[in-house]
């Protein structure tokens, strides 16, 4: 059995984000000046946390964000950054490079909601969820192999993480801590899978519209996993959400504009 924290961060802003254009997987854009500032602010916010593992989408905007976060970290600058294509953004097919309004118009013409619509050549929601499930499987395996001897106690059903609005909320007594840097649509689909399919426990008072809202650039979420092996299968026996889409660190970016 192993208990570990997973902190999820969306990449910083790109010019395509600013211009409300879809990037998906086919358009590999760098961070904008604001995106660099956002990533640095996230790095300063998380600077005192020790990330034992780091997993990053292999798209440029995510890699740059992770590099900046780790560059600001006091304990994790030497942690290996694993680039994983499973963490890429949802593929939007023919809609990539087009305005988001174009995707909405395509969905309306097809008689579907924008969230459920798959443009030609794009990934379905189920395909993206399958990628996240594959990532979780490899994550559980790696964490148990590397940290299976770490001392950790499983939180009880009655345990609720202390949420004080601090960067280490929920992770104070969890020595194994992974950082994942990915993308907006991918994170949104992943969180929905954790909550709806895997029965992730949520903090008291958190409303569902907050849980499933779009993640802002460098928005931060945290989950505590307890995993163990049943025969030859690794599974999570408990998942506790600590916070979702936190953006406190972005205040300093706004104030500097």
From Swiss-Prot:
Its main location: cytoplasm. It catalyses: beta-D-fructose 2,6-bisphosphate + H2O = beta-D-fructose 6-phosphate + phosphate. It is found in: Cytoplasm; Nucleus; Mitochondrion. The active site is at residues 11, 89. The keyword Mitochondrion applies. One of its GO terms (biological process) is regulation of pentose-phosphate shunt. Its EC number is 3.1.3.46. GO terms for cellular component: cytoplasm; cytosol; mitochondrial outer membrane; mitochondrion; nucleus. GO terms for molecular function: catalytic activity; fructose-2,6-bisphosphate 2-phosphatase activity. Keywords: Apoptosis, Autophagy, Cytoplasm, Hydrolase, Mitochondrion, Nucleus. Gene3D superfamilies: Phosphoglycerate mutase-like (3.40.50.1240). The record marks 183 as: Transition state stabilizer. InterPro entries: His_Pase_superF_clade-1, His_PPase_superfam, PG/BPGM_mutase_AS, Phosphoglycerate_Mutase. Belongs to the phosphoglycerate mutase family. Fructose-bisphosphatase hydrolyzing fructose-2,6-bisphosphate as well as fructose-1,6-bisphosphate. Acts as a negative regulator of glycolysis by lowering intracellular levels of fructose-2,6-bisphosphate in a p53/TP53-dependent manner, resulting in the pentose phosphate pathway (PPP) activation and NADPH production. Contributes to the generation of reduced glutathione to cause a decrease in intracellular reactive oxygen species (ROS) content, correlating with its ability to protect cells from oxidative or metabolic stress-induced cell death. May play a role in mitophagy inhibition. This is Fructose-2,6-bisphosphatase TIGAR B. It comes from Danio rerio.
């Amino acid at each position: 059995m192993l208990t570990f924290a997973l902190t999820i961060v969306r990449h910083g802003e790109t010019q395509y984000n600013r211009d409300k254009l879809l990037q998906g997987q086919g358009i590999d854009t760098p961070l904008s000046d604001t995106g660099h500032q956002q990533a640095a602010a996230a790095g300063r916010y998380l600077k005192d946390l020790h990330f034992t593992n780091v997993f990053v989408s292999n798209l440029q905007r995510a890699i740059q964000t992770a590099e900046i976060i780790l560059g600001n970290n006091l304990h994790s600058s030497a942690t290996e950054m694993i680039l994983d294509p499973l963490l890429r953004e949802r593929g939007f097919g023919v809609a990539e490079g087009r305005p988001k309004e174009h995707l909405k118009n395509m969905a309306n013409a097809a008689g579907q909601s924008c969230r459920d619509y798959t443009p030609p050549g794009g990934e379905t929601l189920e395909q993206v969820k399958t990628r996240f499930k594959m990532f979780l499987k490899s994550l559980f395996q790696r964490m148990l192999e590397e940290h299976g001897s770490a001392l950790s106690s499983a939180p009880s059903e009655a345990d609720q993480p202390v949420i004080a609005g601090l960067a280490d909320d929920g992770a104070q007594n969890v020595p194994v801590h992974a950082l994942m840097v990915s993308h907006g649509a991918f994170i949104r689909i992943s969180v929905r899978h954790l909550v709806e399919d895997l029965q992730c426990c949520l903090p008291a008072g958190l409303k569902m519209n907050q849980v499933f809202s779009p993640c802002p650039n460098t928005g931060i979420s945290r989950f505590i996993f307890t995993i163990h092996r049943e025969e030859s299968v690794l599974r999570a026996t408990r998942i506790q959400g600590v916070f979702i889409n936190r953006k406190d660190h972005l205040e300093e970016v706004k104030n500097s504009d």
